Amino acid sequence: MITTSAISTIREHVKTWRSKGETVAFVPTMGNLHQGHITLVNEAKKRADHVVVSIFVNPMQFSANEDLDGYPRTLIQDSDKLMAAGTEILFTPTPEIIYPKGLAQQTYIEVPEIGDELCGASRPGHFRGVATIVAKLFNIVQPDIALFGRKDFQQLMIIKTMVEDLSMPIDVIGVETIREQSGLAMSSRNGYLTIEEKHSAATLKQALDSIVNAIQRGEATQQAITTAKKLLITAGFTPDYLEVRNANTLRQVTAADSELVVIGAAYLGKARLIDNVSFSRHSS
């Protein structure tokens, strides 16, 4: 595995692969890798001739009161995991390489509407930072496909929208969420949970499932959400939001929509956990 922080090195390798008619898959990450990330790499290997992974803790997507400085940086362990998984190039740029003019002078990309709702409402500017870094990494790596976990469902939809709106020749693929045995979605931020909190954390998935089951039984959506919030509060969570949206657009649900997603975020101790469950309005 080649590890580099140089944009020119990435481009040289991609140019060589392209000259042979070979395809490139890209998995962007912020490091502190878990099995969910490795699943993305494994899926990338199935879909393309070459796999590039990036590790970059992106300062643009953190607000002033968030955990940029405390975000876990585990490059040695991450590198070992990626090498074992068969990654060919690991791209590890510094903020100075990505944002040479500094954040204040950086051109940015903003996806309207869906970038301002849900997690975007709780974390102003977050998805502007996400869209900007992903667009920049796409320009550097120039992949045929890029893979993202469906756990970050809103992020996935925003990136798909950006790629479509800007006519980027990249196939964005969402990969199913990898979960702990308890049902808790794997996340780098699970490391913020105490042992006791980790036992309670699976309640978020249970709350989302309860909304799905209630809607499929014909119950009112708002009542299902209210009941689920009570379940979270009892388990020690502070709910941020729980909502049901169109699973294909992330827009508000209309009577005609059948493919839905229940999406939520809640605080547990020092961690802000997110999760989602896609479902059909009427159970089969």
Curated annotation (Swiss-Prot):
Q: What is the lineage of its organism?
A: Bacteria, Pseudomonadati, Pseudomonadota, Gammaproteobacteria, Alteromonadales
Annotated NCBIfam families: cyt_tran_rel (TIGR00125), panC (TIGR00018)
Q: What is its main location?
A: cytoplasm
Part of which pathway?
A: Cofactor biosynthesis; (R)-pantothenate biosynthesis; (R)-pantothenate from (R)-pantoate and beta-alanine: step 1/1
What functional role does this protein have? Catalyzes the condensation of pantoate with beta-alanine in an ATP-dependent reaction via a pantoyl-adenylate intermediate.
Binding of ATP occurs at 30-37, 149-152, 178, 186-189
List positions binding beta-alanine. 61
Example GO molecular function: pantoate-beta-alanine ligase activity
Catalyses which reaction(s): (R)-pantoate + beta-alanine + ATP = (R)-pantothenate + AMP + diphosphate + H(+)
* Residues involved in (R)-pantoate binding: 61, 155
Family, according to the entry, reads as follows: Belongs to the pantothenate synthetase family.
Q: What class of enzyme is it?
A: ligase
Keyword ATP-binding applies: yes
- Which residues carry out catalysis? 37
Keywords, comma-separated and alphabetical: ATP-binding, Cytoplasm, Ligase, Nucleotide-binding, Pantothenate biosynthesis
Tell me which EC number(s) this protein carries.
6.3.2.1
GO CC term, one of those recorded: cytosol
Its quaternary structure?
A: Homodimer.
Q: Which HAMAP family match?
A: PanC
Q: Which Pfam families match?
A: Pantoate_ligase
Where is the protein found, in the record's own terms? Cytoplasm
- List the protein's name: Pantothenate synthetase
Extra remark beyond the main annotation: The reaction proceeds by a bi uni uni bi ping pong mechanism.
**Ligase as UniProt keyword:** yes
Q: Which GO biological process categories is it annotated with? A: pantothenate biosynthetic process
